[in-house]
């Protein structure tokens, strides 16, 4: 079977898909990982077929404006900046995934890539699955969403999940 593994995110999001690709290849499947271009060497070093998405996530994550906002710890400004920066890539990434999807009988997507592949798989009648290795995400007042350094204040903790969700949607959808 020709399987496409579509994932977006950091190296930590990519590595589990490399392990999955190795296992699938060892069981006779033809596997291609579709992800950001800066992970090409990491993936091809394992003799896995690679299809690049044009965005270099590491380059975009370490721009001076992003680093400045992170240094100041203002997650609302960070959310706005991520939304603004990601808009220029999302349409192109969806088109790139759409083009390469013709080579797959089945697509397995990460949680961050799932919204991008869903309309493509439905349109082309390609079977798909979602595989998510991220930490659990349940809105609670007991502690803030990951990435938030707020003191443990219950109403702020709950708000942090809305901000986190907004950032995730703007960055990866």
Predicted regions and their residues:
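N-terminal subdomain of nucleotide-sugar transferases
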Residues: 1-51
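Nucleotide-sugar-dependent glycosyltransferase catalytic domains
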Residues: 38-41, 45, 49-173
């Amino acid at each position: 079977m020709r399987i496409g593994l579509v994932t977006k995110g950091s190296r930590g999001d990519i590595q589990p898909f490399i392990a999955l690709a190795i296992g699938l290849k060892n069981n006779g499947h033809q596997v291609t990982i579709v992800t950001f271009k800066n992970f090409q060497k990491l993936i091809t070093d394992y003799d896995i077929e690679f299809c690049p998405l044009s965005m270099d996530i590491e380059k975009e994550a370490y721009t001076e404006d992003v680093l400045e906002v992170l240094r100041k710890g203002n997650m609302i400004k960070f959310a706005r900046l991520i939304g603004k920066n990601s808009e220029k890539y999302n349409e192109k990434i969806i088109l790139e995934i759409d083009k390469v999807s013709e080579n797959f009988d089945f697509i397995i997507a990460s949680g961050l890539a799932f919204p991008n592949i869903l309309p493509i798989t439905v349109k082309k009648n390609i079977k798909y699955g979602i595989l998510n290795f991220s930490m659990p995400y349940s809105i609670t007042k007991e502690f803030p969403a990951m990435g938030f350094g707020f003191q443990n204040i219950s109403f702020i903790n709950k708000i942090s999940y809305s901000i986190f969700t907004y950032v995730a949607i703007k960055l990866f959808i």
